[in-house]
Structures are given as C-alpha cells and as structure tokens.
C-alpha cells in the first residue's frame, strides 16, 4: 500500500495505544464483489477494518456502491464520538447524506486537492460534479488538518475554510534504529531508490531520463501502477536496463530492505498532488539522503531541507536532477551527512507519537489546540 495507507494504519494503532477505540472503513485494494470485515493485527494489538468492495476504478477513483451502507453499519456498531475523514476520497463524501454520520463531530484530514493545474479535463469534469458534496463536508467539519504550511496557500477548495485549518505534519512509526547508518561505499555505483505507486504525477519518466545522463549510478524503482508499461518502454528505449530495475509491488519488509541498501531516495514528483511524501519520512528514518523536486505548493521541499537533510532540484528538469544525483555520486560523504541529519529531523518532527498527540488534541481528548497553531 501507499504512503497514505501506511500513515492511516500507523495513526490507528498509535491512537489505540493512547486509549482510543478505533475502527476504519477503506476500499478493497483490487476489484472485489464483496466487502470484508476483519480484525487487523499488529504487535499484540488489533483494529477493526471494514473493506468496502471496489467494483472498478474510474479516473483513479475507486467505485464502491456499498461504501455508504458499510459506513452506516459501522457507525451503528461503533457509535463513535468523532469521524475522521481522509480526503480526497469521493466515497467518504457519502457521509454528507447519512443522518447518523451528520450527528457526529467530523475532523477532515486533507491529503491533497482532487484536481490541480495538471489534471486531465475528464478529472476536472468529474470534480465539478463532486465539488458541492466536498464543500458540504468541509462546512460540516470542526477542523481540517493539512500536513504542511506550504500546501494551504495553494489549495483552492480550502480557501474559504482557512480559519478551521490546522497544520499537523504526518508521522510514521520507526522501523529503523539510529545505529543502522550504512556508509555509502565509494568503489561501487551510487544506489538510488524510488518507492511508490507508478502514477502519472510521480515524475519517474524525468528520473529515468536523468539516470540516462549519468554514470556510475544505479536505480531501483519499487511499486506498481498505471505507468508501469510506459516506464519499461523508456528503460528499453534509453538502453539503461543494466543500471535500472523495476521491481513492481513489494511488501513493507522488502521496501525497508531496499531503503537500507540504498544511498539515497529520489521523489521527483511533478505536481502538487504530491502534497507531502510519506516516503520521505521512511527514508529519513532510515538515515538516507532525499532528493526532491521544488513543486510549488507541495510539502516535499518543506519536509526536506535543501543542503541539510537532502537536495532540492528544479521541477521537471532532467539536467538539474542528473546534476544533483551526480553530485551525490561524487561526494559520498555528503550523502551520509544528509541522511544522518534527516534521521535527526525525523526524530524531532515526524514520529507517529507526535502526530497522534496533535490529532487527538483535536478530538477533544487533550487540551484544545492553541490559536497560534491554527493555519
């Protein structure tokens, strides 16, 4: 699963450890005729997870006719004090029409806007239909959480609701020990890893063309998605298959191994749809340098401090990315230093305990958040 799913599960289990009773409703990963209910287990703990059947996807949106029924049923079963909606997710907007849901306090976690300047006309048309319900949900919510201060000024849907917006950075649990620094070995190629769904906005085509311009650099792309076949074609057309490997989907343990064995992580996303980049936290927790694009209105270059915890390059620039990677190839100590500072920043700002404490304060379980923290 992707970064948002990782964050959501970490938040659920961390909230449970803080004394909350939690349950989640999500979509099935692939196409499914029937919904499922399971107790999702992790480290002697468990959380109720309802997976609403996804019939198919339209413009990357899961179509799940049973979502509203499953949500009503879950509310009746759990009788929650708070509903925490992770948007964008058109299925979650069924909450607007469910009387039992409307009687409960809502917190919205705004992960990204559905449409950006780069979105297709079809997605923009679909959004025109969804927008009134999205507006109703935002109006009903007590708070709207955004993950970085750089995102909010560029979000058109949130423009009218800035007074209820609160910035809480995402966080993840620590899968790496600080002692696990892996030195970048000079007498082998620089190892770059890219983790995540092969989506249109991820900029992997830019990364492949940049790798083609470099020497002594190897790339592992870990993930699957709609761009897989076009990326394979680029690899073949550029004749870089000896240095580039596309691995497809991987388990969490396999992803951790790829991070451990790499020298740096590259997230070359080209669009504000990449509002934060949870994978950056995974790399920083593993003491790896991060290379990111300077997308305006994204949190990527806020999470990664240029020349401190990573390097930021000009968005969509093949030559700038190639030069950035060459710099790390030439200066392996820089890669190590950036990674170690990234680990420190992760510990100070992006642990799951920190984000959980801030989120629970909005639920009313802790003292109300101070005015200075409101966006």
Predicted regions mapped to residue ranges:
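A conserved mid-protein helix/loop that constitutes part of the nucleotide-sugar donor-binding site
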Residues: 6, 190-213, 226-233, 278, ...
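N-terminal strand-loop element at the rim of the active site
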Residues: 10-63
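Donor nucleotide-sugar binding/catalytic pocket of nucleotide-sugar-dependent glycosyltransferases
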Residues: 26, 105, 124-179, 187
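An aromatic- and histidine-rich active-site surface loop
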Residues: 32, 64-69, 80-115
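Acidic donor-binding loop of glycosyltransferase active sites
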Residues: 142, 243, 260-275, 288
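Nucleotide-activated donor-binding/catalytic signature segment of Leloir-type glycosyltransferases, i.e.
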Residues: 232-253
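A short, well-ordered alpha-helix in the C-terminal region of glycosyltransferases
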Residues: 243, 320, 327, 334-349, ...
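Short hydrophobic beta-strand element within catalytic cores of glycosyltransferases
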Residues: 286-294
């Amino acid at each position: 699963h992707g970064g948002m799913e990782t964050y959501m599960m970490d938040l659920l289990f961390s909230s449970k450890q803080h004394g909350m009773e939690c349950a989640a409703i999500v979509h099935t990963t692939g196409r499914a005729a029937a919904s499922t209910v399971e107790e999702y287990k992790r480290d002697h703990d468990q959380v109720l997870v309802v997976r609403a059947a996804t019939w198919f996807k339209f413009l990357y949106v899961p179509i799940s006719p049973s979502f509203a029924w499953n949500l009503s049923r879950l509310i009746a079963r759990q009788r929650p004090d708070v509903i925490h909606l992770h948007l964008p997710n058109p299925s979650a907007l069924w909450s607007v029409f469910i009387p039992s849901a409307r009687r409960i306090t809502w917190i919205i976690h705004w992960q990204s806007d559905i449409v950006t300047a780069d979105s297709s006309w079809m997605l923009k048309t679909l959004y025109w239909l969804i927008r009134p319900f999205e507006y109703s949900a935002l109006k009903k919510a007590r708070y709207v959480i955004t993950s970085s201060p750089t995102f909010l000024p560029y979000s058109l849907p949130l423009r009218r609701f800035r007074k209820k917006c609160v910035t809480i950075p995402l966080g993840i649990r620590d899968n790496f020990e600080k002692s696990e620094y892996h030195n970048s070995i000079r007498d082998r190629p620089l190892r770059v890893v890219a983790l995540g769904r092969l989506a249109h906005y991820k900029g992997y085509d830019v990364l492949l063309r940049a790798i083609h311009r470099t020497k002594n650099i190897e790339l592992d792309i870990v993930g699957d998605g709609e761009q897989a076949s076009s990326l394979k074609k680029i690899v073949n057309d550029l004749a870089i298959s000896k240095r580039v490997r596309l691995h497809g989907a991987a388990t969490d343990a396999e992803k951790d191994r790829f991070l451990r064995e790499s020298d740096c992580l590259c997230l070359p996303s080209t669009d504000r749809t990449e509002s934060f980049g949870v994978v950056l936290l995974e790399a920083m927790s593993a003491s790896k340098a991060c290379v990111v694009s300077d997308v305006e209105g994204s949190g990527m270059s806020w999470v990664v401090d240029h020349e401190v915890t990573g390097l930021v390059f000009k968005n969509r620039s093949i030559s700038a990315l190639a030069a950035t990677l060459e710099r790390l190839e030439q200066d392996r100590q820089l890669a190590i230093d950036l990674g170690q500072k990234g680990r420190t920043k992760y510990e100070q700002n992006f642990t799951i305990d920190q984000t959980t404490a801030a989120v629970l304060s909005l639920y009313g379980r802790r003292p109300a958040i101070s005015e200075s923290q409101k966006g």
